Structures are given as structure tokens and as C-alpha cells.
From Swiss-Prot:
The keyword Transport does not apply. The lineage of its organism: Eukaryota, Metazoa, Chordata, Craniata, Vertebrata. Disulfide bonds join C7-C141, C28-C44, C78-C232, C120-C188, C152-C167, C178-C203. SMART domains: Tryp_SPc. It comes from the Eukaryota. The keyword Glycosyltransferase does not apply. Belongs to the peptidase S1 family. Snake venom subfamily. This is Thrombin-like enzyme ancrod. It comes from Calloselasma rhodostoma. Glycans are attached at N23, N79, N99, N148, N229. It is found in: Secreted. Residues 1-227 form the Peptidase S1 domain. One of its GO terms (biological process) is proteolysis.
């Protein structure tokens, strides 16, 4: 996160650190939405993945940190791996549920559509340098605003005129999500309204907001998968 501050240690109990499973390279963020389920971006998918819950600093370990791996992964488009504009979402069923603790608790899905102009909060362990990847040891948090979708249309090549994505950022270019923040939460009104999908290169440019997968638009799919009514798993 560019231009953010270290998150309060108690404000990100739902934030998940996603690692490549073989060499423990940090990949992305994710969000705990249920004791057994995590939501993240599809482009964060790797053959092997490890997920860490209750983490603050990567270099320190809390007593209540928990590690899990995917039991099953669900995508919107069953037999495809290529990411498209508005389907950058993945549900992960954990190998076993996590337990709520001082530093671990799920975040609610949105009950209403997001409102343009809303003050929202983005967080993650991603790059704190807009031009070269310098990952943060602790999660950084920044306040950004939701903008009209048309503001993002045209900023990204081949982007459709409509899509299930949110456009959010600081138009002065001071605060933004960045590389390796992907899959992490965009929180508005204390609900999960978006997950980091993609943004301008370099990050945090004036009048160039980033794109977030709109969770409200996938709410039914998420609930159906969790209820066992969907079979879209590779």
C-alpha cells in the first residue's frame, strides 16, 4: 500500500497472508469471510499455497497465528485459468476451519451495493514503493474513495464499459494499493466491498484509480459455493 500507515494491530483480524506453498514467497492478501473460507483474487492462484491467519509483522509470530492450505479452490469460470476483467475472484475452502482469536475473525460480506464517494480502507503487505517492489513487513492501511466506474474506463486497455469491478483511489496520487496487495480487502462501512484486482503502473498516479473486484456483485455466487450448491472447482 502506497501512502498508508501501519494498520492498527486490532483492525485486520480478517486479513490473510497468502504464500507460495513450496518456498514460502509472499504472493498476495486474502480475506477470511467464514471459519472455513477465504476470498482472494484469481490471479493469486498457485499450484501450492499456504495461508497465514492472525499475522501482523511477517518477522514476528503471534501465539494465535494459524496456518492452513486450500482443500479446494473455486473460480467463476470453471475450465479457464486466464484472468478477465471482472472475474478476478477465487474462493478457497480451507483444509480445516480456523478458530476465532484475539487476532483472527471473519469479515462480513456487503449487505448493500457500494455508494460512489464512500470513504473506504485498503490494506495489505504489498509494495510501499510505487516504482520498485519493496514489500512491507507489517500491513499498511490507507483511506481511499470510491469513484464512478466511468473514471476507470479508458484508463485500462480493452476494459469493458460495464463490469463487476469498483473504481477506487486517491485522485491526488498519494495513496493506492500496489503490487502484492492483490486479493486484499477494500472495506467500506465495515463490510468487504472489494478485493484488490489491478491498478496503474506505476502505482499511485494522480487521476488513475485502481480496480477492485466488486464483492456485492458476486455475493450470490459466494453464498452458493459455501452452501455447497456450486461445483465450479478445477
Amino acid at each position: 500500500v502506497i501512502g498508508g500507515d501501519e494498520c492498527n494491530i486490532n483492525e485486520h483480524r480478517f486479513l490473510v497472508a497468502v504464500y507460495e506453498g513450496t518456498n514460502w514467497t509472499f504472493i498476495c492478501g486474502g480475506v477470511l469471510i467464514h471459519p472455513e473460507w477465504v476470498i482472494t483474487a484469481e490471479h493469486c492462484a498457485r499450484r501450492r499455497m499456504n495461508l497465514v491467519f492472525g499475522m501482523h509483522r511477517k518477522s514476528e509470530k503471534f501465539d494465535d497465528e494459524q496456518e492452513r492450505y486450500p482443500k479446494k479452490r473455486y473460480f467463476i469460470r470453471c475450465n479457464k485459468t486466464r484472468t478477465s476483467w471482472d472475474e478476478d475472484i477465487m474462493l478457497i475452502r480451507l483444509n480445516k476451519p480456523v478458530n476465532n482469536s484475539e487476532h483472527i475473525a471473519p469479515l462480513s460480506l456487503p449487505s448493500n451495493p457500494p455508494i460512489v464517494g464512500s470513504d473506504c480502507r485498503v490494506m495489505g503487505w504489498g509494495s510501499i514503493n510505487r516504482r520498485i517492489d519493496v514489500l512491507s513487513d507489517e500491513p499498511r492501511c490507507a483511506n481511499i474513495n470510491l469513484h464512478n466506474f466511468t473514471m476507470c474506463h479508458g484508463l485500462f486497455r480493452k476494459m469493458p464499459k460495464k463490469g463487476r469491478v469498483l473504481c477506487a483511489g486517491d485522485l491526488r496520487g498519494r495513496r493506492d494499493s500496489c503490487n502484492s496487495d492483490s486479493g486484499g480487502p477494500l472495506i467500506c462501512n465495515e463490510e468487504l466491498h472489494g478485493i484488490v484486482a489491478r491498478g496503474p503502473n506505476p502505482c499511485a498516479q494522480p487521476n488513475k484509480p485502481a480496480l477492485y473486484t466488486s464483492i456485492y456483485d458476486y455475493r450470490d455466487w459466494v453464498n452458493n459455493v459455501i452452501a455447497g450448491n456450486a461445483t465450479c472447482s478445477p
